[in-house]
C-alpha cells in the first residue's frame, strides 16, 4: 500500500485553463457517505476549470409515496434544486447539474412516456437521457457494488425495447451500464435503434476479478470495445475505473503515476478506437474518490491525454459531452 500523503497543497494542477465538462457524477446522502452540493462544490473549486457537470441517476432522493414507477421523479426534483442553487451565481461559475441522466423502468413499454415526461418537467427540462442497470454475470461474486443484478439479457427483452423505442421519440440518449462481457448486448441494442445515442459507461464496465482475473483480460476487453466502436451511435465514457471489480492492484492510496499506468491503456484504447468525438471524460464521483481527490483524478486524465492535440483534448474534455448532452 502506498502511504503518500495527499492534500490540495501537494497537487500541482495541470493545464488549469482547460475547460472541462464532468460528464458523469452523482450526489447522495447515504449512511457514511454524504456527497451533496457543498461536497461537490469543494471539489469543483480544487483547481481545475469545470465549466459544467452532468448528473447521472443513482437512486437518490426518490419519492417515498405515490406510484412505484413515478418515485424516480424525486431524483429529478432534487437535481432541479441543486441546479437552481448553482444558477443563482452565488457559488461560482460552474453550472452544476446542467444536464440530467435520469432513471426509468423501460420495461414499462409505451407506458414509460409518463415517467419520461415527468422526469423532464420535474428536472426543469434538464433531462437529456436515461440510464438503467443491465449488470449481470453468472458469477454473483463479481458484483462488488450496491445494486443487485438486473434480469439476465434485459437489453434484449421485448418489453425493454418497447420502452427504449420511446427515447428516440423524446430525443433522449441512453447511458449503458453493464459489465464488459455484456458489450455484445449493447451492440445489438445500438444496431436495433440507430437513431438513439448510446453512451457506454465506465470504459465498458471492466471486470477484472473472479473468473475474469486472467492475463488475457485486456485483449478480451479490447476485442469487444473494438466491435462497439464500429457502431456509429455508440459513445464511451472514460473513467469509472476505481471500482474493486476492475481488479487493479495499486493499493488503497495510488499515486498519479500508478493510476496513469493502470488506467492509461484502457482509456487510450477507447480514444484511439472511437475517436475523441465519441469519447468523454467522467469523474464518477463520489464512487471513484477511493482512488484519490477530484483534482488528482483530473490530473491523471490530463496526463493520459497529454499526447493528443489541443482540438482532440477539447473534444475529450468538453465538446463531446456538451453536444451529446445538449449543454448550452
Locations of regions flagged by a protein language model:
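Short, well-ordered coil/turn segments that N-cap beta-strands
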Residues: 16-19, 48-52, 92-99, 124-128, ...
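Mid-to-C-terminal alpha-helical segments outside catalytic/metal-binding sites
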Residues: 1-19, 23, 35-43, 51-52, ...
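Short, acidic/polar
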Residues: 37-44, 76, 109-119, 220, ...
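Active-site gating/metal-coordination segments in enzymes
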Residues: 2-5, 67-182, 188-191, 204, ...
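Histidine-centered catalytic micro-motifs
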Residues: 19-30, 200-203
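Catalytic pocket-lining loop regions of alpha/beta-barrel enzymes
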Residues: 150-280, 291, 309
